[in-house]
Amino acid sequence: MHIEVANNNGTKYLRLAHCRRGTNRKGVRTIVKQIVLNIGPLSRFDDGKPDYLGRLRASFRDGRPLIDALKPYVGDAPKAKTTVTFVEGDATCIGSPRRLADVILDPVFEALGLDELFASVKHDSKIRYDLTGIVRLLTYGRLLDPASKSATMAQNGKYLRPLVGSANDDSVYDALDVIDRSAAKIFRRMNTKIAQGIGRSPKVVFYDVTNFFFEIPRPDEDVADESGDVVERGLRKMGVSKENRRQPIVQLGLFLDDNGIPISFGTFPGNTLDHHTLRPAMKATVDTLALARFLLVADRGMYSGTNMCHVLDAGNGYIVSKSLRKSSRAEVAWALEADGYDKPGADFRCKSRIVTRKVRDEGGRERTIREKVVVYWSRAFYERERRENESFLSFVERLRANPAGFRITAAQSKSLRRFVKGDVLDKKTGKILDGTKLVAMIDDEKLKAFNDLFGYYQIVTSELEMPDREVIDKYHGLTRIEDQFREMKSTLETRPVYVRTREHVNAHLMICFIALTMMRLIQRKTRQALGPDFGKGLDWTYGIPGARIAETLREWQANELPGGHYQMLNASDGDIATLFRAFGVDVRARLYTKGDIRDLKSSVSPF
């Protein structure tokens, strides 16, 4: 027996039903459903807490139903017996398991409004191929088994019910063009559905930039008009790779809400500086989504007067780190001064002040803004910086002790240039002269200033009244977006290996964005199912790691048996049991039909 929801004139009713194999009026063997008990309207019993229906089903399954009227039926369901006959030569004699991941993924995809969106795009564009099916297949494939677009299309037959109805696999490349053109619609639809389903949490919006490298022989060329003026910059350009690769890259800027759910992203040529991505990304996405006022939290690479003016002019605020090593001497001196710190001598101490800065906005006009500057010193941060620079500082001391005994490598030469008093380079070769001449040129004041800033960090904010520790805590939430990038580069294997054109690169990244958002929504449900003690003591947690969710959904399969029966595989315990509990899916130890599996999908509570 199972609990189901029936809709009667707009009112949802709970009822207890029992399904069994039987014979209908025409004498055909089929599934017969019997309504055992009409429980009553859902609104009468719903306690207002998250996922009431899932908890009710779980309580009935565990023998402790939340509704007293169900107690007489606990454990009374008759045990169905099914006879399966294998006939030699029947294909079902040899197992051929198919994926069931779409039982959970389809409701999440639909909850984001993407099925309706792509159906509308298909209708308006008079597309003949299965656009929605292709987007689903590409997205689910990116979650479960990342591969090229062609290889992902070949995965269609791995699902119990194929996701794509059209047979022409080449349509996937046409679909990529459509996805690229629909980017703004996708962002708006997903944001609207998330806001309606779980409530978008835009009080804090995180932003950061990563990049992806391409193994191609040369960067993309710019497109110029007849006058030689650049009308479109090439996308795959040489830049500073996050993975230290000397190959063309594409920049990606990602926005994230305070729940850890992605909001939108923007792509930029690889030679675009990080702080030049913020304003275009905001204008193209978050500025158009009608979000309530939020605090933009970003790393020091995003800080510039022009960027901060744009954030303020849009009615928002900001919390952004600012490099102390690139600050003025007066700012550094104030940070190092012991006066003003809340806990002098402690392993973590901070202080703040309000300053007035003159900056220029996007139009070049001079503006005056007031900011709160928060500086803190952390012993943990100090130890980390000291370890990171230990090898170089040790080299400098050994160089002092024995200058004639060193040959300076190219890497050491680059590091040393920051700490020399004058020009000690060979103008013809560009190399540093021998160690005996170099050691006398080391600027001890610069070296001391470098060491003095170990452990210090500076944050600026528009929120003049916000307590210092709250500013620091909100800034530290930026680690969530770093986890998004790790998930994209590992579990989702986002690096665009098999796409070439700008449109297809953008579409590929959009598929990865949708997959990442779905992953976070699934993890959010698992975190709720794991209870309040899960992750206790951590600053934050997404629940079950993304790689484990992908593996669990990939391995949840069904094997076809004679007579239209299906045996579920890898569906009993561990992470899959947590997923079932999280989404209110009641999977029992029995054989299933395709109708039963459809019922499981309809019972999923995506938000």
Task: List each language-model region with its residue ranges.
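Conserved glycine(s) in the ABC-transporter nucleotide-binding domain "signature"
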Residues: 1-132
